[in-house]
Amino acid sequence: MLLRRRTRIPRVWPVLALILALAVTSTSWQPAHASPAAGSGQAVPPPPKPEPIKVRQLPLPPVTPSIEAGSCTTENNPRGTGCIGQSPGLFSGNFLPDSRNIVATVLFTGAPAAPHPSSIYTGQQLILVRADGTTFPNGDAWKCVTCGIPPGNAPGPADAMDYPQAFGDGKRVLAGTNIIDCGPYKLADRACTPQRVRIYPIRWNTTADGSGPGGSIRELRLHPDDTHLGFSSMTVTGGRLDQFSYMGRLQFNPSPTTGTPLVPRYDLVKVSRLFDPNATQPVDVDPSDPGKLRFDPFVPSVGELRGFSADGREVTYVGYPAESSNIDVFAADLTTGKVRRLTADPEYVDPVDLSPDGKWTVVMDTRGTDRLSFLSAMRGVPGITDLLSASAISAARNNGKRRFFQPYLIDAYGDRGSYAGQRLNAAGDGSPGSINDPLWNGRADPKWSPDGTHIAYWQSLAVAPDCGGQNPLPCPVSTAPGGRTERLMIADLTSRPPQTREPVVPVSDTVPWGVPYEPGSAIPARTHLTQGTYTLDGKKSGSAEVTVTENSTRTAISTVAVTYQDYSDDGRYVINGTETMTLQNDTPFHNKIDWFSDLVRTDIGTGRVHATKRTSPDGFHLDITVGTNKFQATGTLTTTVDGHVYNQPANGT
């Protein structure tokens, strides 16, 4: 069955000998004290010792060098079970409940024309990949679940099948806006054949009368109760790109009478928006004194939903920066709204998965690369200018399709002191194709096995135009089978015994700190500070004077200017100086930022200058488009911490 790719906003062989590497610890150098994860309610223990990790590359279908019909021959694949291209369109997902199989989607290509039996291996398809070195009965280390589905078994729209996630019953997979179902059969069983597989679309009703195709949903994440679904939906507020996250119940509708498509489908019902415009926001006016601001990143502020804890109690998300220019992931209790900060490294993170026992976090993070440290390495600066810069900083994490992510394992207490987690794929010599080759970059999402002994992740290689040509980074030559530019990896946590997953806690259809969504209701405008001058008091000492200027239509903030005077939240360091930022958007996706900074962070006890954050005299001017993610700037912004200088990346890199 051919599944066409739907346009998305990016944020986007034969069995080979397993590649093994013993991973040693890799602790990112932290330029300053990193706060532990909040909300533990317990004394924070010392960081864990490095543990032994072996990383293997898992097999995928063989590669055909051409995408022409018929180019996948028995010479490429003697079993006639299909080929993928050098750019295989890989999306790695989670494990089936047996911890032996990983769900993934790939783009098959080069199939012969029908009625050849191998003609079914074409287009985007769901596959299972053996994670334990064994094979399926036909001798392949993978099984295509959807290849050859009769058209009547998938009557809905052919939407992209990204971010595949297996249900706990082992019989169903969420892939894109579809649920792939093998009825009473487990997907890995021989009895689960394409003739028994059904694909059902998911629809979110957004009209009062139930008409139309429903709302646009993205970044879907399955709740571990197999009943609820988290998702995000983009919008525009005040001419700027915005996004809200939601949680709803999946309800099978075998015979819909309203809305499209009019085919058996899953409807999202009892939906809650994880944003309440009437609740306290991370940066808000003090209700007892309208001239003062309150800054609290530990109120629920879901920027983009990223998943759930294994027991289902918490939702994970990219949150409002707890420190200026430092984008982290958080977890909020779905009932109480209590928030934990999962990461605190100055670099960028968003892909995240919590371990089955709830004691560990795995992330894809730019830590160790210094990609964004020129913005964020000075610690303890409250996220005030982030009212304008969050989207642009998020876009700067990539260079086009080139990512800078690597997988890190962090304990539940988070980054602290010099501890910044353990890199899963640290071992190796960094040579082309090695486990720790820096040009193989992580993608979303890393996933734990249900028994807690493995972590699956996938990577892509930098390719033109994000290298080569005018780009100063030469394009690497792939050493992967067939020269493909994506690979599926598994990290074996060899010293860990199999775990028992935490029981899933029943959750309500209503999130108390969210707002029930009424189909047809207007999308709320995200509130913003009104024009004026405010004072933000440091938690320990000092203050910051914050001047907010709105745009000409008073629909959004255009400029934020901050003057710090002996400002301190931790009682160890004070911040002095000024920072001013202006944002212009000629389209919702295009950000032009004018940034002037002259900040100094000083040790209270000794008076020693610990860090500075300064722009060149003419300022730092960033021009970047969300989705394109090409870094272009004039002027400089430089952060220095204890003599360590962090410079911005070169334009186009």
Model-derived regions, located:
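Secretory targeting and sorting signals
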Residues: 2-34
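Sequence signature of WD/YWTD-type beta-propeller architectures
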Residues: 38-653
